[in-house]
């Protein structure tokens, strides 16, 4: 369940969250995996693949912040298949934290991408 914003400055930090802004220039799987590994301080065992990204987003025990906010400036420039996997992975990671108190994961996209994202999430991965 993504959150959508009109103006990213509307996203107010509270409780000292870890805020990560995904650069608009990220264009492939390797770049986005490396970005997450650096920004969220993934452990050395991070496997540089989609499953490893999901596993780390569902753990996050190494981060001192309770809230993690991932803010996108646009829908990623990944190829169609990777984009589907990435969005579904983020959605599943958010759901995995529901009802948990250890961490809260919030993922934001611009409001004008909502229809596109919902359409992507409806389509099968393979």
Predicted regions mapped to residue ranges:
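Eukaryotic endosomal/vacuolar membrane-trafficking regulators centered on PX-domain-mediated PI3P pathways
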Residues: 1-46, 50-126
């Amino acid at each position: 369940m993504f959150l959508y914003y009109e103006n990213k400055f509307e996203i107010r930090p509270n409780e000292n969250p870890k805020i990560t802004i995904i650069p608009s220039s990220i264009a492939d799987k390797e770049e986005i995996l490396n970005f997450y590994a650096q920004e969220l301080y993934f452990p050395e065992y991070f496997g540089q693949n989609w499953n490893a990204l999901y596993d780390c987003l569902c753990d996050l025990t190494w981060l001192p912040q309770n809230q993690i906010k991932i803010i996108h400036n646009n829908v990623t420039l990944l190829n169609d298949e990777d984009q589907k996997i990435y969005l579904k992975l983020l959605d599943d990671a958010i759901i995995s934290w529901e009802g948990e108190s250890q961490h809260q994961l919030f993922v934001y996209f611009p409001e004008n991408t909502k229809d596109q994202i919902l359409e992507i999430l409806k389509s099968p991965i393979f």
